[in-house]
Amino acid sequence: MNKRRIIEVLRHGQADDQVMVQGWLRTKRTLKDFSFVEVNDGSSLANLQVVLDGSLADYDRLLSQLQTGAALVVEGKLAPSPGKGQRVELKATKLELLGGADPGSYPLQKKRHSFEFLRTIGHLRPRTNTIGAVMRVRNACATAIHQFFQERGFLWVHTPIITASDCEGAGDLFKVTTLDLQRVPKNGEGIDYSQDFFGKQAYLTVSGQLEAEVMALAFQNVYTFGPTFRAENSNTSRHLAEFWMVEPEMAFCDLEGDRQWAEEFLKYIFKFVLEKCPEDMEFFDQRIDNTVLATADNIINNEFAWLTYSEAIKLLEKADQKFEYPVAWGVDLQSEHERYLAETVFKRPTIVTDYPKDIKAFYMRLNDDGKTVAAMDILAPKIGEIIGGSQREERLDILTQRMQEQGVPEEDLWWYLDLRRYGSVPHAGFGLGFERIVQFMTGMANIRDVIPFPRTPMNAEF
């Protein structure tokens, strides 16, 4: 028997094909001499309609056990479907119940469940239409990311999850230790980390950028794609404690090249997902956010807007809209400012460059004016910042000065400074929050619903 995924059957199956499908029952409808059941195997949004004839072996017993959530194996012959919505249906010649589901306790019944409720049953929510569609789009996004960089000769590098440095300087780090918390060793300065596993204080990484720079200065173009962590006590729809980051790093590249790479990258991802997940994207447009497809089209077919931070401040100061946070040169843009620029002023993704040096990280290249750095943020409608990047400071003396200004210990990053001593070149990179792009693409309101197992304050279930 030809084992097939349901998406293959629905797209390519022909009448009289003998097939076997495996999946989970979504709905059952019983008539006098036969029944209809809808089966889903996770490969597509659509279910496959299976026709069970009353003459099927053990029909009555099987029918009584076929409840929503039950796992099935069905064999039979495809036939043209007289109903609307799909070309073929499966007329069963054999049905096997692999695992039942008690209708009295199975929480996913044929009704609409809130996303808040679904988060409490994270082990079952992938079986719902919406979360299933999110995960297929997430998979397509990840595939697109790798394909984009691999087609362009980038090397995928694996940077450490455990680190001794705070790349971003934010301070919201998860500490890693094997010390006995009941008997913590002390010295004159406090905890004696020399007795810890690594002989020094260690953390979960917030970024693989610094290590990616190491690799870029050997292999030219590289990218990282992996989990990052931030112990920021934020219970909002935009924050996760564990999230995935994509961080390309390009040697012999300046801010203009960085901007071009980032724009091409975003357009590629959206185009790829629209081609690979058309039914899922249509679902999001109809059920979640009716601007999803228009937003994708806007990104793919329009040049991104581009202006400096100073120009952005002038536009915001002249805005008719009242902002919660004041606008002033030297103050970082808030989400409301970013969204105003992308949604109201330019109505498309917007790239803001050349931020004040005092609000950006030490590794960003100082511009000739001595006040700004060669940084960029890409702002997306409804989301705000979706990509942050910069040309890196390749000049040893200026990098050292910037570290001193920001209180970054040189001894902790001696190896990073060495990169500027031996064969230093202009280089640049950017970071994309993976969940942010999935959220932006699907229109999902809460970032906790675009990752399989969200990690947030007071929540590490499943």
UniProtKB/Swiss-Prot annotation:
Homodimer. Its EC number is 6.1.1.22. It is found in: Cytoplasm. It catalyses: tRNA(Asn) + L-asparagine + ATP = L-asparaginyl-tRNA(Asn) + AMP + diphosphate + H(+). This is Asparagine--tRNA ligase. It comes from Synechocystis sp. (strain ATCC 27184 / PCC 6803 / Kazusa). It comes from the Bacteria. Belongs to the class-II aminoacyl-tRNA synthetase family. GO terms for biological process: asparaginyl-tRNA aminoacylation. The keyword Plastid does not apply. InterPro entries: Aa-tRNA-synt_II, aa-tRNA-synth_II, aa-tRNA-synth_II/BPL/LPL, Asn-tRNA-ligase, Asp/Asn-tRNA-synth_IIb, NA-bd_OB-fold, NA-bd_OB_tRNA. Keywords: Aminoacyl-tRNA synthetase, ATP-binding, Cytoplasm, Ligase, Nucleotide-binding, Protein biosynthesis. One of its GO terms (molecular function) is asparagine-tRNA ligase activity. SUPFAM superfamilies: Class II aaRS and biotin synthetases, Nucleic acid-binding proteins. One of its GO terms (cellular component) is cytoplasm.
